[in-house]
């Protein structure tokens, strides 16, 4: 039987500014007899097969990329050996090349649950990582991102969520929460988190205000700015004698409901 080919990695992307063509380059994969080239309109959009090349080729020029935006072209390469397919490469795009692995840029073509899964996966790494080295940013292009089964985007240390629209009305997000980094709901160490320039949409009837609220339970170095908040806002994580919070800087924000 055929050996399963190794996973490859896309290492480079270049765009021809005259023709718009985009050229990707990848690493040779052990046991690969050919490579399938896939393209999507976003990191978490639907990847479709656009071409297949032989194993002696480790670059591909897409002469007909999506032209609605040069940035709406994300690529994956799959190594193939006969009827045995290898694991897909990680996605690559002009945005990833420009901003690096720890900045995620989303657009309206992306699967909304996949976005939630990634944001909350990163939160799992960052929740208690007060002295860690990793930094993350999630940038949302104009669109509505509320159609997700996730309760909210949870954000921890060294994480930024930002809308890329001209106004906060251009990006609609379901909800954001900052779970306490210390015991007893104490958020006095919830530092170094930032949210800005989007709408927090009211998608529930608001009857369970404690769970439905925008929870900006933070300490210093945690700005929330230029938001349009349709939900009730809570500035603490939970009730209790030791459930301390120390504010959090909020500016240039419109609240449609109670804050406290």
Per-region residue spans from a language model:
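Beta-strand-rich modules
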Residues: 62-85
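Short beta-strand/loop motifs in extracellular/secreted proteins, especially
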Residues: 33-36, 73
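Pro/Thr/Ser/Gly-rich low-complexity, intrinsically disordered linker/stalk tracts
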Residues: 1-31, 83-98
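N-terminal extracellular ligand-recognition/capping segment immediately after the signal peptide
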Residues: 101-104, 108-160, 166-178
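Extracellular beta-strand/beta-solenoid scaffold signature
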Residues: 116-123, 135-136, 149-151, 174-190, ...
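Recognizes extended acidic, P/S/T-rich segments that occur
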Residues: 36-68
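Predominantly polar beta-repeat domains that present long G/T/S/D/N-rich surfaces used to bind, process
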Residues: 101, 229, 240-260
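Feature marks extracellular polysaccharide-active and adherence modules
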Residues: 141, 162-167, 174, 196-201, ...
